[in-house]
Amino acid sequence: MAHQTSCASYTSGRVGLSSATAVVADAAGREQTQHGSPLFPIACYAEDLSCYSVAWHWHEEFEFILAALGPIHVDVNKTRLTLQTGQGVFINSGALHAVEPAEGRALLHSGVFQPRLVGGMDTVF
């Protein structure tokens, strides 16, 4: 028998959850959540998209999204991607994006992190 996980126990790390969205954004669509801390600016999330979708938003951080149980639709700017279980996508800094289940139960894992973790600060790279 498959283990059933409730939305409340599977969803971790998001603030402002509602039945419609897992993102708190300003009028321009910029996400207001701080991911990680100033000393370690990275956060990882596990989300059950059966309970809500992730509304259109953007942020300065990079984001990796992995379909832990798919399929899931990931919309980035004007492109819709459908990720099957085990597939992932990289979302660049400043890219407008949204996520929703394609059908049935859908779970995702994501990592959101500052670009300086990859390129450093005050460098030419």
Predicted stretch roles:
Residues 1-82, 87, 95:
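Generic protein-terminus/edge-of-domain signal
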Residues 94-124:
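Ligand-binding loop in jelly-roll beta-barrel domains
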